[in-house]
Each structure stands twice: as C-alpha cells, then as structure tokens.
C-alpha cells in the first residue's frame, strides 16, 4: 500500500470513527452506555480475531489475544450488570452491526499489522473517552463504578497499542 493510499485509508477510517463521537453525548444514560461500551468491546474482539488470522508479527498477535481475553471478560461483566439492573441492552445482532460499523477494513500482510496498530490507538482513545464521560456524568452508580474500575485496563491497552504503533504503525 503506498503512503498516499495508506493516508487516504486512515483519513477515511478516522472520519468514520469520529462520526461515532457524536454518540458519546448519549452515553450519560445507562442503556446507551451499555450499548456503546458493548459494541466497542465486540469491535475490539472482532478486530483482534482478524489480527490473529492476518497479522504477521508475534507482538501484534499477542496483543490481539489479550484484547480478546480482556474485552470478552469486560463485556460479560457489563452484560451481567445490565441484567441485574434491568437495563435494556440491544440484542446481539444489533450490537454486532454497531461493532462492524466501527471496524476498519484491515489489510493483509505487513500492512495489516500497521492498520491494526493504528486502529487500536484510535479505538482505545475513543473507548477511554466514553468511559470517562460516563464516570463523570453517568446516571447509574453501578455502571459508573464498572466504568471507573475498567478504565485502568483500557489505559493499559492504549499504552500497549501506542507501543505497537511505534513498532508497526503510521505515526502522524
């Protein structure tokens, strides 16, 4: 992939991802937070599965497995909490559709590792923003506690994603 193509690819991807930033304002409501956080978790899991399949670097694959493990666990806790608190949660198909809309069309080979690393930085920055916004202005104390407890792991993921980006990704 040429530099121009890569920049165009990431510009389009960023435009798509920033479109979801408008939804963050809705995150103050518990149901909306549950849906957005779940969809972002599913997107993390699905892109990580792609990285295990298409990635070429061992560090990318190790990071991807960690994303699958950690985000599966977080989504399970979130679903359990939503059920306990009688919060409405979109069905799995709707959440998967939201997640798919967040997933970049990642490329094969070396460029896949680059695209995945760059995607993970942006995705984790947005997820951290969603969780921080809920901690600061959310309406459900239990969800606020979940968000607060999950933030350190998300921040750790962002740090690791930035390390991957330094090794494999495009730096702007």
Question: Over which residues does each language-model region extend?
Answer:
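His/Met- and acidic-residue-enriched segments that coordinate or traffic transition-metal cofactors
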Residues: 2-172
């Amino acid at each position: 992939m040429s530099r121009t193509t890569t920049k165009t690819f990431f510009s389009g991807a960023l435009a798509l991802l920033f479109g979801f930033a408008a939804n963050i304002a809705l995150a103050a409501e518990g149901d909306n937070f549950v849906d957005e956080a779940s969809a972002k978790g599913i997107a993390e899991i699905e892109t990580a599965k792609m990285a295990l399949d298409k990635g070429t670097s061992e560090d990318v694959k190790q990071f991807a497995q960690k994303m699958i493990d950690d985000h599966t666990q977080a989504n399970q806790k979130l679903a359990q909490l939503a059920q306990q608190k009688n919060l409405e949660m979109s069905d799995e198909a709707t959440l998967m559709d939201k997640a798919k809309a967040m997933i970049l069309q990642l490329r094969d080979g070396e460029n896949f590792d680059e695209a995945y690393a760059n995607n993970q930085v942006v995705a984790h920055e947005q997820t951290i923003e969603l969780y921080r916004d809920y901690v600061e202005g959310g309406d459900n104390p239990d969800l606020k506690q979940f968000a607060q407890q999950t933030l350190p792991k998300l921040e750790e993921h962002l740090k690791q994603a930035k390390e991957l980006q330094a090794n494999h990704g495009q730096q702007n």
